[in-house]
Amino acid sequence: MRHYEITLIVHPDQSAQVGTMMDKYKEIINADGGKIHKEEDWGRKHLAYPIKKIYKAHYLMMNIECDQEMLDKLNYNFRFNDAILRSLIISKNKAITTPSIMMVNKDKEKGKS
């Protein structure tokens, strides 16, 4: 099995359903023998450019280990989910379990308050 980093940009009107959406994808990954090494919710952020006249979106990131068949199944689900504006799947050499830069910056901002 290979390691992947998946980043999703979700429509801001669907932010309340992010939890159930992630549970659905976790079930797909775990049912087929995959593993989730890290899952992060980056929250709402400004987009660099508007997508479908939307200027803010909800960002999610997962590091998973799965086979190509499961990855194709996930990608199919991402494409036909209207709530997902964009998805990015990057192949990685190994599992990454450390917090991402986005989460480290978020924790620093909370510490300053």
From Swiss-Prot:
A GO CC annotation given for this chain: cytosolic small ribosomal subunit
SUPFAM superfamilies reported for this sequence: Ribosomal protein S6
Disulfide bonds: none
GO terms (BP aspect): translation
GO molecular function: small ribosomal subunit rRNA binding; structural constituent of ribosome
The UniProt record lists the keyword rRNA-binding: yes
Coiled coil location: none
Keywords annotated in UniProt: Ribonucleoprotein, Ribosomal protein, RNA-binding, rRNA-binding
Cited Pfam families: Ribosomal_S6
Matching NCBIfam families: S6
Known role: Binds together with bS18 to 16S ribosomal RNA.
Similarity-based family: Belongs to the bacterial ribosomal protein bS6 family.
Protein name: Small ribosomal subunit protein bS6
UniProt source species: Vesicomyosocius okutanii subsp. Calyptogena okutanii (strain HA)
